[in-house]
Amino acid sequence: MLVVGLTGDLSELPLADLVQMTSIGGKTGRLVLYDEEDAVAGVLLFRDGRLVGARAGELVAERAFYALLALATGTFDFDPTAELDDDGVDLPTESLLIEGMRRLDEVQRLRRRLPAPAVVRYRGGSTEDPLQMRVLGYLGPGARTVGDIVAGALVGGDADEYDALSALSSLEELGVLRVEPPAEEEGESGGPPQPELEP
């Protein structure tokens, strides 16, 4: 019997659709995902349509799956003959997809509310939440951009962009942090009108 793998582009066949096809078809194999630079972004392992392993950098299991679900571009390679060194987990594919899509929607909403160039300043107060404490520790007494804080919060491998933005949002709502809009670039509205140059 000939066993054929599947290779393709994530912009044409999104990961959510690919996972659904693999799950519904009861497929077994290793799905390797590559980013735009053709570097390995992560690996998903399936046995009889069930997700039995997920890795993305230092993230594993559900967190790895959620991070990989955000890949909109890149390529994939599904190898049904690969030996599976699964993580000893059995992840419910359908509920992971539902939660993953919810998290993607929430990240988009948080990105609009907390754009990467926005400046974050400490106002005072504390928290006992470990990730919020990490955000505060990374911020320190000065000011940093949302993008810098999110990148700093991801160090350690147990958080993703959703977690970092959610922690920032919660700290802002508690009044511990203040998020200021990005400074307008020179020449934008707010300054005196510039004289027109005649040709």
Predicted regions located by residue number:
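Acidic, Ser/Thr/Pro-enriched low-complexity segments and adjacent helix/loop capping patches
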Residues: 1-199
